């Protein structure tokens, strides 16, 4: 080791370089330069192996006065024989060769001496060929260190010296750690290269999109796009072929950097076959890039990749020439020497629109070899010459994985752009239109849907497919004839187009499907919730009557919806699933819409399962209340709400009330459910009042079973008392038919309710058989007009007369009327003219969840349809004093809304999508938060913990863990976040053969697993047992994959009940998977680097033999303590110790015994100098030093005597010594540091004391203190 270069300086310089923006070659050069200076040798080089076994010197630091430079030279595979590669790669040994003595010593790459060599004096013989090889290089000492990467031998780091030299244990370990630093630098370089490749890919996609969007379908557009792709992929030439389309346009081709015209050549059968991606079975093209994107249930890839159809195929000219149908190319092709072709079909979903062909010329590769071959007999092993010579190799260039992927991405963009132009042209052709409705037909819809699927693949958005069919349209044709029916379909098409025209943001496409069916394509969809208002907008098309032969006809329609990528990934599957959802909508009463669910393909609902689930629904808190506002029709003011119960099934989603209410009555559960509704409604009423200061009438429906229960009345009164709700704010709704079952009992019960202040309304009035005389006896407040009458209100028939009669009757009895199911402005205006008091329905506002209802109470102006007064400014008080001035209910909270107000249309989106937007906001914040933590912290534990904590909080699930695989594909839970219900499973090791056999392969492919109910899922029994052991009812598993290596799994557990995982849950974890994988890899990389640096720091301050401080640590500690004690005016004591007659000990017992002796003495010193501020160091050879801070002379003498006792107790035999055992001589110096005195004065004084102690006869000590210190040249 260079005595003028401390290990600390070396370490500091190496570490600092890793924090700079250096290329891999620059980083390697820094390492070899610093290593050569530190070791004090003539050459340090880093040598990388090529795939053929040869290698190249990538970095070198050399003393040219002693050895020649080898930088950039290639060495043949024979120069490192298989035996050497075995030792370096598989056994991972570092090998030092002593050429002069023809021997070698090896250490494990960990830095430890291997046991087999320890027993053999560390050295073994070296092959004579290798000795002569090194001598020819001018090398007398060498150290070869393997560099590993991904468990493979990447290269070597070689140290050469032109003189004999021994490498110390410290140098061995230092070089082992430097090898680790090189491996980390290589990994970091690979990571940077991947990031750069991703940036290039994104930039290319952006340029292509911009070019096509800006210039459209022009030759200049395609020519520029082709040139852009060719340059990005680093091709020497390129051809873009655009096939004929359905409009009859001829094929087109564009070419870049080619001299001859490819037009006729591309029309040959061979090139048509190659361009369509259908090579002959006899040909074996280069392996294509595998890329899949499967839907998230049950497995899906972590991130969307390009479609499998646009797969590049690589060929060489030699392979093509072997084809029997090969036609010799024009002379110019041969003259330009094109030898390699990458052909990418522009195709997706079996629709081929053209091809991209990339070409590369034959390359000349110049290599400089170390030593001539063949003609120079000196190169016969052992080699005697390393004179450089130049070789020019002719290579057929290949296309690597990243270039293939880039070509695939570019081809997909070209496919989408060309297909878009095809669609544009097709739309202008009559063949693309339905002759009846003049809408695009199935040809356009299929092509546009395929294009939208590809676009969504890269945008990260959803695609929606809607199939609409008229309800009972067959009766129209039968009653009025097909000609009239055709005219009606034309009017339906016009209305649908009008409804779609404001939805340009979704790029809607309406097409005629077949019969009375239409299809609609919507793009840029974020999730299913976003589609709900769009579907309702479309269904509102049928609220106004159609007129046939002067007669108004009311039509209804049903709609089925499927979405990509979650329901399907092809046009065929999406249309199939949308039609299945349409069937479900028709089965649920028509005039509605339904989204496709996987269970739709099977029988809709398993009654036995539904019964079982319903019994648990209350316990599991699966019921929720929605609130539909009741509005005064003359003023638009909000007067009350009706509480409506909804069942949020964990697997089936929302189950319709007409399904579960009759079932609850049949199972005897309706009383419990009804009581829950009452309790929740009253409690929510009070919550609304506390938060907004507004009192509303809360209407609650009562079932027949409840009404007939003798205890029911008391339960109502107790509920009011318990919740504190004023009785006059509660309205109980009973049906007309229920009232007639026991009229006397009903009258008595209703009188009791009225006495308590509770209001009563008769629901569905007009559908039963109550008489006027009975009605007069009932103490009721309101009559509710059934929705069935309101639906036909505008026909001016019997239903209109019934409604007018009910209103007149209510007025005569001094009752209010409430109209249900108002769904159009015309209905609203007609009811206003008829004198109806109150109304509710979708036209006013749909039922709202509690949080959305709260928003409505704060801002009721958003839903008003009355006059348009100036909107008052609502200034909330800033202080409690201001808040106390006046009644809360008197605040100027506006409660009128004009439907012409620009906010009107936006509120429906707000109140219904509020929860989804909140989730999206949380999701975006979570992704940003985790990304920021990744950038802010490189601590692997922080990264892991923040990931599971934030994901569990977002998903609101019971447990989230990170599971890490080991080399045998078992593993351990390394971190977790869980609630109190779930037991902790952190550090649990899982080695389950069932898991390995059934699911490991899928996770290694990067697929996601979502299981909503493990008991009903198609899982192996052994896997179910494993999940039950961990209390799991439902789980969501995302593989953590980096650089195609599976690190582990990010797993979410639901432990109480099954859970249907929403699409956004999957999307969140899929988005996070890549971020987590990169973060973990960076954290582990940093952890490895820190470990290596800490070890370097340790060996830079510890003596390799005795493991006490070394000379460097002694010098730095002495300087530091001298400065500290100078400030506090405390003494510093120094003991210099020397083993007596140690040379004679080595000569008599041997050097290994001498090493063991020094280690025992160092251990004895550590026992007596044990304060935190004390330091024991090996000063050199058999000399040791002990620094004792804040220690007087008396204290130093005590330590000295204790040390002599400890050494005597060791009883190490020493026949040459006068005492018969090993002893120490000790020199002591004690001084209180002063600014004008150099600490070296203390060292020299202790050294003089040691010299005098030895002169007294060994095993003695002598001390100097303060003014007694002899004069030395130590003053500053």
Curated annotation (Swiss-Prot):
A GO MF label: cyclic-guanylate-specific phosphodiesterase activity
Disulfide-linked positions: none
SUPFAM superfamilies: EAL domain-like (SSF141868), GAF domain-like (SSF55781), Nucleotide cyclase (SSF55073)
Domain spans labelled GGDEF: 461-598, 1130-1266
Binding, a tetrapyrrole 2: 1022
Coiled coil: none
Domain EAL: 607-861
Transmembrane portions of the chain: none
Segments of this protein annotated with the region Disordered: 879-899
Region of interest (Bilin lyase domain 1), residue spans: 1-197
Keyword Protease: no
Alphabetic keyword roster: Chromophore, Photoreceptor protein, Receptor, Repeat, Sensory transduction
Residues annotated as domain GAF: 23-186, 939-1080
Superkingdom of source: Bacteria
UniProt-annotated binding residues for a tetrapyrrole 1: 129
Any GO CC annotation of this UniProt entry: plasma membrane
Post-translational modification summary for this protein: Contains two covalently linked tetrapyrrole chromophores.
Family (UniProt): Belongs to the phytochrome family.
NCBIfam families tied to this protein: GGDEF
UniProt protein name: Phytochrome-like protein cph2
Gene source species: Synechocystis sp. (strain ATCC 27184 / PCC 6803 / Kazusa)
